[in-house]
Amino acid sequence: MKCRRIWTTIFWLLPLSVAAELLQPEIGLGWTNGWVREWRRDVPGLKVSDCSERVSESLIKVVRRWTWTGTTPLERVTLSVRYRVDGDAKTLKPFIPGVLLYGNPSNKGRTDGRVPVFAGEPGEFAIFEEHRVPMPFALLEDARTGAFAALHVLPSPVRGAKREDLWWSIGVETASGGADIVMLSGPVGYNRRWSVVKALQNAAMPYDETYITLLPGQIVEKTFWIETGTATAEEFGFEQALDVSLALFRPYDAERFEKFGDIVKTKRKFALSRWVEGPVPNACGFDMYDQHYQWRHLTIGWCGCAATCGYALPVLNLDPSDWDKAQRSLDFLCDAFADTVQTDGLFRVTFDMKTGQKTGADFALGEAVGGDAVSCGQGLYSVLKAIRFAERGGKGRLDTSKWRRFAMKVADAVAADILRNDWREPDSTGPGFLVAPLVVASEMFGRPDCLAAAQKLAGTFERKYFGYDAVYWGGTLDASCEDKEGAYAAFQGYLELLRNAVASGNAAAERRYARLARHAMNMMLTYTMVWDATYPPGRLSDHAFKSTGWTVVSAQNQHLDAFGVLTTPEIWRMGEYLGDERLKRLAAVMYRSCFQLTEDRKSAV
């Protein structure tokens, strides 16, 4: 690597698809009213140098080094990296995976701390701890020209911090004549509030005094990569940055996790531990809760597994008794909820085993109304897949008559509702979970209206989300923001439409849905951890937890969850269609990594 003062020449080293430059380093000194007191370019005794290496035509690696040569500690210091992108800040769309997706337009104008937003207005900033960013990069993409610049970073905690477990931060802020991608040695803030973090669901949490102290002779180094490029018809800027992030971190080692076969057997054992019967006559199925919990609920979709097991157990075929449980559970669900199907096809999704009451998804809120599109779509998809397997590979061991009647009733009603002239387009992508089952129903029941409805619904998502003005959102039932579940809804639907197009030989539809499926999948994948964060002393570090393969929930709920496991079959299928082994290897890591933190009792740690 070449080491020199490169901040005045770095933009000459990259293609000029975007007017941008690495700014001269500034050092923050002092701390007043929750932020850096002043910024200086020269601090006597503090040496700053950059070492650079060209990785590819569009990517340069930089290691910035700060060396404190003073004889006494330098206190209340903030180190920084700034990359200036010229242009209109309002059209420079910021993308920080899992945190700020093109500015989180679904919450445009929000000023509280629930969801971060960024519209490029004067004085705006959005800066977050690196450990919250699953694919550690920040990007600015010009919505008019497609030109973009991104900083990829090697995440790290900071030595010499007053606060325990302080990490570097990364984000964006507006500047004169453009916007900056910034990296700071700790300070954070968003929605025009300095020194707050997104650590609570509905509010910002104060996070002050994020400065450091440099000791005599101390050296601090920060590794980052500068990427520039231009969006194309085949790849937006965030998709190109995703490819670079995967190449840099290579999150493909599945062998350090439990074996796939062992995981499947354990999951089956856990599912069977939830099997319940009565006291309501003939009621049986897979409980949403542990046996010791006060409630006995069969719940379809979302966090419930009531319909899923009826499909999965016969496919696995690990024990003859599993087929009987699959038959009985789906028979009961289809009987129990058939009379709750509304004219729009939605139905109640929770059955109380003690009282026989049928409610919506969130029983705790007393939702005695129809279910939501997310849960109903996921539940219908499970029933249809169970029918498809039973009739293709079940060898007559399963009776699908009740399943067919229920699925046909729901699919016909959903399709009729969507095809109405006065149908109201959904605000979010959550109803996208209806697309995939509609495609399957159209083939299974010979219902062209179901396919037409699936195409109409998918078309609304294409118009809204295949661009910069809106991002897939609203798939998480306990949040209202950009989220991976909304992207998954679109991806799953597009993938079924792609399969249908391939099967029918419709080349134009295949090209269209292949691109849309890849876009939605890539947006979904940006929520996936591609690196192993380190953790302070506690149960996560006790178990040497590896975060690679887990997923950030949403812009509002910036914590890790195992939901990404549900997406792995589709990621694998997309990898097969594209001939992309990376996707298949990543899917394997996601599935196997998310088995961590499971005790012998098979309950979450």
What are these regions (language model features)?
Residues 6, 16-17, 504:
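Short, intrinsically disordered, low-complexity terminal segments
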Residues 232-605:
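Glycan-recognition and catalytic cores of secretory/periplasmic carbohydrate-active enzymes
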Residues 1-10:
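Bacterial N-terminal signal peptides that target proteins for export
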Residues 11-20:
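Hydrophobic h-region of N-terminal signal peptides that target proteins for export
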Residues 2-3, 15, 136, 300, ...:
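Generic secretory/membrane-interface signal
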Residues 22-403:
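Carbohydrate-recognition beta-sandwich/jelly-roll modules
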